[in-house]
Amino acid sequence: PPSQATTGAWRITVPEWCRDQRNQMTGPADDAELVVKMLNSGAPGVMLDLEDSMANAWPNLMRGVANIQAALTGTLTYEDAKRGRTVGISTSQVAIWSRVRGLHLSQAGVIPGEITSASLFDLALLVHPLDAASLKHPFAVYIPKSESAEEARWWADVFKAIAAAKGWPSDFIRCMALVESHPLAYQMEEFLHELRDHIVGLNLGRWDYMASLIHWNLRDPHWVLPDRNTIPHDVPFFQRLRHLLVDICHRRGALAIGGMTALYPSRTDAELNARALATLEKDKRNEAACFMDGAWTGHPDQNAIAVAQFPEPNQLHARLPDVERYPDLRPAPIGVGSITLGGTRAAVRTVIRYRNGVLHGRGASLLDGYMEDLATDRIYRLMIAQRLLHRDHLAIVDGDGHPMVHDDALVARGFDEALTMLVAELPIGRDPGDEDTLHEAARQSRLMIENGFCDPI
């Protein structure tokens, strides 16, 4: 309904230090070498992640927080064993964004017998030792997994309370927020309004958003997701949201940032490298044509190509003509991609390998050329669950084009076959526990699918 948020004349002011965000490079904060390389990559923005690309474990969190604090003060280093030297952060104006864990997660063990908001705990850990005078980069936060404008009000209150406790100006903490849940797509303007003293932009977190779309359409037999890697980046359920996000952000003076291109370049496979960079260029060119102001990447070799697709530091002055104010944001993916047994098999193999990485302390893993984190795991778990729900009238085919029934037996067989192959692929001389960990990864993944776990865990 109309409100001050949607009808008022309010505007957001983007500070000079972050007006150019044509590429934001992202990666887990607990890897000091990766953090230094991202900060030295030349990307105008870097997002240091305590959330989906980092396994949610206490040692990782402590390393990640320490690395972010050292990055903000310009003191972070790592030891380059190959060259026998210490590598630090080059002096630059790169904007550093710290992604804390979302409000869907809690932290135990802080207060005896109680649980604490993981978001609040991460923020408190980060800012407690920080002295504003020692910061080489402004303190800025990436907000994940929000579902409503009410959450934005909570974040605004927290930012102001922290600033008051630290003796900082009330608007000292700046932020961007990810639109990666379907409900938030309907409250983007209200979300910006609640955080207008702090927020500088919104980001389309498209892989988590895809998972959220499956979740919200899980029981709709007319809304079944095709194989993920057959879905084009400009599929209507993404493109309509891109157009709306840009229109709202630019009307209010905020940046609009595009999503991650998951296919990574390779320095050892020329064919994969060429395909990955061509995919990147096409993807970012589409986002630039929608008048987005930048996008995400995760590999240094992607930076120059990503930046080159955006014609100027930002496109805040530009808006697409005739953008619907209330578009259909849930168009069914009909006539898009394909639904195949191969897609289910790829999903099964990926969720096992991803969960195996988590059990080894890795929140993101390079799998078959794609950098996969929790968002991919969610998509594939939900995709398999959705195909099981609609097995009776789902047109799914095998590699020879023959129709299949996507039932529990097919999925169980897929897990057994994938597990056998993954165990066979383990290297000679492996750790004796590696096979057991793979079995545990498969067990956990199957249990999540069977129990319909949809939340980002």
Predicted segment positions?
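Flexible inter-domain linker/hinge segments
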Residues: P1-R19
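Conserved alpha/beta-domain cores
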Residues: P2-G8, M25-D30, K37-L39, M47, ...
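A short, charged/proline- and glycine-enriched loop
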Residues: E16-N23, Q93
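Conserved functional loop/turn residues at catalytic and ligand-binding sites
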Residues: G42
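Active-site-surrounding "flap" and adjacent substrate/cofactor-binding loops of secreted or lumenal enzymes
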Residues: W58, M62-G74
